[in-house]
Amino acid sequence: MAARMLGLCGRRLLAVAATRGLPAARVRWESSSSRAVIAPSTLAGKRPSEPTLRWQEDPEPEDENLYEKNPDSHGYDKDPAVDIWNMRVVFFFGFSIVLVLGSTFVAYLPDYRMQEWARREAERLVKYREAHGLPIMESNCFDPSKIQLPEDED
């Protein structure tokens, strides 16, 4: 059913193309499900004439190949001197300034989340406790004598 409808539509398109003088290509379809072959019928035994091609020159060429004029083009400008200058400026700022100054900036950023400060403070506290004969760590974070608990009301 589908193959028959497809063949009918194909024949109609070829007939319309032939009556209007449009170039029509011979088309042949093969259905994968029903293994039917659909080919257009010959239209009154006439073979359509080959289309004539007319050369039309583009008045404004948009796509110029810069490599014909300058084989070492970097794509920044049509003029070779400006192209090389722009390439050098881009690479100078891209590598020298961004990489060198950027890495220096990252190296001198302040202490992230104060990790270095916390380590120095812990080392200072350990030295103080060892010098005064105190244990390095206590089980109580707060002095138990200073904590006031509510009274038991049974």
From Swiss-Prot:
* Highest taxon of source: Eukaryota
| GO-annotated cellular components | mitochondrial inner membrane; mitochondrion; respiratory chain complex I
Annotated region Disordered: the residues are: 40-77
Keywords in alphabetical order, please.
Electron transport, Membrane, Mitochondrion, Mitochondrion inner membrane, Respiratory chain, Transit peptide, Transmembrane, Transmembrane helix, Transport
Query: What residues span the transit peptide?
Result: 1-29
- A Pfam family hit: ESSS
Give the family from UniProt.
Belongs to the complex I NDUFB11 subunit family.
- The protein's name is NADH dehydrogenase [ubiquinone] 1 beta subcomplex subunit 11, mitochondrial
Q: What is the lineage of its organism?
A: Eukaryota, Metazoa, Chordata, Craniata, Vertebrata
The encoding gene is: NDUFB11
